[in-house]
Amino acid sequence: MTPTTELTRKVLTDRGFSGWVPFAGLGDSDIPKAAGVYVVLRPDTSAPVFRPSSPAGQFKGRDPSVAADVLAAAWVDTATVLYVGKASAGKEGRRGLRKRLDEYRRHGSGQAVGHWGGRYIWQLEDSASLLVAWCPTQPDQNPGQAEFELIAEFVAAYGVRPFANRNRGTATAGPVP
């Protein structure tokens, strides 16, 4: 991935990201079963409105809701990318983007599914209009490294992680500039 000053839909599309569908449309999308990275984008750059509680599922009894002041502190003005995630193939090669994005969608719809990362997005009033895009990684490329590099690029542009990323990803190679 070539660094840029801003991660936009156009930049990401030029890099091979596709989809750009709301979570509700993921089931009808041709999402690859391969490993890769994905992003959640908010096309609207107006100030966010946060729900008082999250509609997401309570996996292992944990409430995914976050206080509004915590959400506001994590918000990145002018950024459209809200979350960067990864999907590994898994030990048996049965995971990948399709399965991981389905878990994320189901978690947001209230099911008790294990997708704790990125949970902040579900407290946005306009979460139904967020767009999801994905990009398979090459067979010799670790999706955790690709995720780490995208997050590092975002940090270089904005000084902080994307809104819903609470960690910097999983690097498997050397440091990212």
Q: Model features per residue range: what roles?
A:
Residues M1-L82, K86-P177:
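Boundary/linker segments flanking structured domains
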